[in-house]
């Protein structure tokens, strides 16, 4: 039928034609995707070859046939769309086949192109409705429809290019070329998501989500939900529509978070609870493989001392190799998000604060300029996002005097000027330095951790040693989330809306253990991907060497992290978004004063941090060796201060002890940080002692040291 000339049809006849085309097909087995890829590669070769030969031939011609002009002017479309189709078909699972030896999708695409040659989306939707009334397409087939349509068009073009003499002699008419390139242009410039979602039988079930959340999720999250339905259908040997309906039926009977059908796709797939990984097996694997490597080194070096001293450097190699393999074997775990197309809603009211010291009269205006930049970069978040400076003064041996007051007043004036310029939306939070008995200096209580704790107390309406020096205080009462940044961290375009969208998703809502006061499911904190600022990364040769390329990756996708991908728990590094209520419940008065320098790991563990790899912040980095090692010293010192959290009982914020609420994975992270801090020491010690032994021992010690450092 597809070889006959196209005949215009009304809507009813179009649907009937599609249904008849489906009835003619008889399913038989599967066809590997590599067969489609092979056909498409051959077609692209023919098109490229024809274009090259005709480009040379046309130089000697005074006039060109119309079809040749079409090909030479538009061949790039065929190459571009063909390459995209090849990428989509790469390493795909087999597709359903027909008795003709082709895939069902190829037959569907060919008849669709005959019936709707201009690929008008409204008409194509009618065609798919008719076709699927007889033979429903799977989610995977729908996801590959556009690439297969492109491949079919490239195949048609290759057929015309096979007759070079006919092209040169004008036997191929321009009317044969026009619909092919018109179709490729439509595929290239069209937005196909709405069409494919409308044609999806699974989508029609999922949009009935009793909680009402599914239609308001972003496009990627909805697509992953459909993919999860397909995975579960395959696992339990169900039809995709049947699996989706089962999840919907369970959600209709559920209450609270279980009323969202996503619960029955991820938390209790089709009613069968999944048991989360604890991290014990991962820690045992690293430990066991490290011991095995040490025993092997003992035999190779001929002395147990080398094995004992090098077990920590060997563990560096083992862990890095294991993580490298796991990141490639385990698919990334994207975080579900709400779309927030109208901006941050009232129930997601968000305050973004830059935590910083005021070190001079110019500090406040500089920080205010940052806030203005962040506001302009995140206008899509709307009025429910506001920004502020969370300011302290540097440590001092005397109470705050006229100088400190002048610095604060300069910051207040800068924020007030922004409020006047933009009609509000900016804040200055300030803490007057208090005397610390331990340090015998005037300083902000518990530095950054204390500043955030007091900010949360202020937001919760509790007494706090924090003053609102500028900004509308009444708006703060209903703040639900806080984005915390350092002075050298940049909030990139659209990042605030992405962060809040992740926090608002029902599957990410934190579940707090009332006894332990830690988050046991969901996430109360998200850590975005952090890249190095482009300017900071190029400030010195040292920064280039240790800071990487720097800048924002505009083509970046979901980031991989072993902890998040395997255990649904990321690692907090001090920049991100957290829930005000969960922070107040889990962290207020939780830790002893003056004992914890590195609090990010503990906060992330208590709040069950997640990694939002789709969002990115940029941060500064040390540009001198001294700055790098000073920062490393602070980190290592802070890691060792967390040693008590490896035990059964840990200090609390009231001078007593409580049962350690940390899960095994969080304790492993603490232990791993301690191991990593000792590794260079043992490496150096082994190299020094290796010089006193045989050359073989020294060679093994040096080899392990180099590989450990490089890994």
What is each PLM-predicted segment?
Residues 114, 133, 137, 151, ...:
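Short, well-ordered loop/turn and helix-capping segments at boundaries between secondary-structure elements
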Residues 150-160, 274-323, 528-532, 572, ...:
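Alpha-helical bilayer-embedded segments of polytopic membrane proteins, i.e.
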Residues 64, 312-319, 323, 328-351:
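N-proximal low-complexity "stem/linker" segments adjacent to membrane-targeting elements
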Residues 6, 25-42, 62-73, 77, ...:
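Non-transmembrane, amphipathic alpha-helical segments
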Residues 3-7, 15-20, 26-33, 37-64, ...:
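Basic/hydrophobic alpha-helical interface regions
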Residues 6-99, 424-481, 643-676:
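ATP-dependent phospho-/nucleotidyl transfer catalytic cores
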Residues 171-280, 333-656, 660, 667:
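Internal catalytic domains of large membrane-associated glycosyltransferases
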Residues 101-142, 149-166:
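Active-site activation/catalytic loop segments of kinase-like enzymes and analogous catalytic loops
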